[in-house]
Every structure is written in C-alpha cells, then in structure tokens.
C-alpha cells in the first residue's frame, strides 16, 4: 500500500474508489494498491 499525495491508475485494471473519505486504488496487482488521505 502506497500513501500518496496524488493517486493515479498505473494499469488498466486499476480502479479508483472513494471509501469513507479516503481515495483508494484497487487492482489485481497488489503492488498497485494506493491510498490518499
């Protein structure tokens, strides 16, 4: 899980989701997991 100031999709499988006030990136590649906030 990377915590970043700007979350971006790394590949086309990445999905950007807003969950309880935090913006997250969910992907089948575990290295692409990110969150902001």
From Swiss-Prot:
InterPro entries: Ribosomal_bL36 (IPR000473), Ribosomal_bL36_sp (IPR035977). Keywords: Ribonucleoprotein, Ribosomal protein. GO terms for biological process: translation. It comes from the Bacteria. One of its GO terms (molecular function) is structural constituent of ribosome. GO terms for cellular component: cytoplasm; ribonucleoprotein complex; ribosome. Belongs to the bacterial ribosomal protein bL36 family. This is Large ribosomal subunit protein bL36.
